[in-house]
UniProtKB/Swiss-Prot annotation:
Belongs to the queuine tRNA-ribosyltransferase family. Substrate binds at residues 92-96, 146, 188, 215. The gene is tgt. It comes from Francisella tularensis subsp. novicida (strain U112). Pathway: tRNA modification; tRNA-queuosine biosynthesis. One of its GO terms (biological process) is queuosine biosynthetic process. This is Queuine tRNA-ribosyltransferase.
Length: 367
């Protein structure tokens, strides 16, 4: 029996306002989860993440398993004890990382054999191992082990990949056993609606605590992503959280909420921050651009983050040019605050029954 509880508070069209509850804390939805690949969101402390409104973060099973390994993490009790984050943590299963290794992997019915990107040694990962690693990490939300269908894929390739993922989903559920953490199933099927339907039907039959849409934002055109979302999101169980994996831009989040999604994660705000790409209420600023050299205005006049309250575009441009670590930190603080504030605004609009209006306004102003 899972310790997770999901309350659907309100709906506007397909958009949903809810709350996911765990012993470690509540998550107001729609929610964005900052990504802490190695247990840490790059350059930020848990205190800073909490200050910007994050209620859950994502950790990476694959990378944490390879380094430092679960024995070291278990000495701290859990990943929470290791990284000092005392709120909920979702861990992905490692399936996407294995997918991204490309030709360095060998896929069989049993699992995946690959060369460790750390020392080149041979490593094997299966649904059973992924479930054990996530149990050792003490994750609040565990993701079932799947194969992320590549893009482009023929219908035959997408079908075979999806069917393998469904067999692995069943093995993940069996191996999860008496673990009280929530277990989410992942819908695959590439860009083919009928395969997505088959996948969802199978996952409902196996029965999971939440459902995720995988295999999007892997290089497909935006209209394909929206087409699959339009088709799939509203068919997912109404009484369980819906999670869109690895997505995306601010516009993507607004459009996915409109279609009924509750949870998101993406490296974009933190990765882009380190490359000088800043999200603002009017669109993206590239702080490296020489036009900001003597610009004494803040990044975003509508933002209340530490960066916007204390520093100018000119100073952030200077930090970027001189490759100061502080530049990455200040940019990351701003970008992740922007994402959390966007989710707060979405939740407020849903609370007040004006999300349709909010979406229209946001899409018109955000370039």
């Amino acid at each position: 029996m899972t310790v997770m509880k999901f309350d659907l508070i309100k709906k506007e069209g397909k958009a949903r306002r809810g709350k996911i509850s765990f012993p470690r804390g509540d998550i107001q939805t729609p929610a964005f989860m900052p990504v802490g690949t190695y247990g840490a969101v790059k350059s930020l402390s848990p205190v800073e993440l909490k200050e910007m409104g994050a209620e859950i973060i994502l950790g990476n099973t694959f990378h944490l398993w390879l380094r430092p390994g679960t024995e070291i993490i278990k000495k701290h009790g859990s990943l929470h004890g290791f990284n000092g984050w005392d709120k909920p943590i979702l861990t992905d299963s490692g399936g996407f990382q294995v997918f991204s290794l490309g030709k360095m992997r060998k896929l069989t019915e049993e699992g995946v054999t690959f060369k460790s990107p750390i020392n080149g040694s041979k490593v094997f990962l299966s649904p059973e191992i992924s479930m054990q690693v996530q149990r050792d990490l003490g994750s609040d939300i565990v993701m079932c082990f799947d194969e992320c269908t590549p893009y482009p894929a023929t219908e035959k390739e997408a079908k075979e990949s999806m069917e393998l993922s469904m067999r692995w989903a069943k093995r993940s559920k069996d191996a999860h056993g008496d673990n009280p953490s929530a277990l989410f199933g992942i819908i695959q099927g590439g860009m083919y609606e009928h395969l997505r339907d088959e996948s969802l039907a199978k996952l409902k039959e196996i029965d999971f605590d939440g459902f995720a849409i995988g295999g999007l934002s892997v290089g497909e055109p935006k209209e394909d992503m929206i087409r699959i979302l339009d088709h799939t999101a509203h068919q997912m169980p109404e009484d369980k959280p819906r999670y869109l994996m690895g997505v995306g831009t601010p516009k993507d989040l607004v459009e996915a909420v409109y279609r009924g999604v509750d949870m998101f994660d993406c490296v974009m705000p933190s990765r882009n921050a380190r490359n000088g790409h800043i999200f603002t209420s009017e669109g993206v600023i590239k702080i490296r651009n020489s036009k900001y050299k003597d610009d004494t205005s803040p990044l975003d006049p509508n933002c209340d983050c530490y960066t916007c309250k204390n520093f100018t575009k000119s100073y952030l441009h200077h930090l970027d040019k001189t490759k100061e670590i502080l530049g990455s930190r200040l940019n990351t603080i701003h970008n992740l605050t922007f994402y959390q504030n966007l989710m707060k605004s979405i939740r407020k609009a849903l609370d007040e029954g004006r999300f349709a209006e909010f979406r229209k306004e946001f899409l018109a102003n955000y370039k």
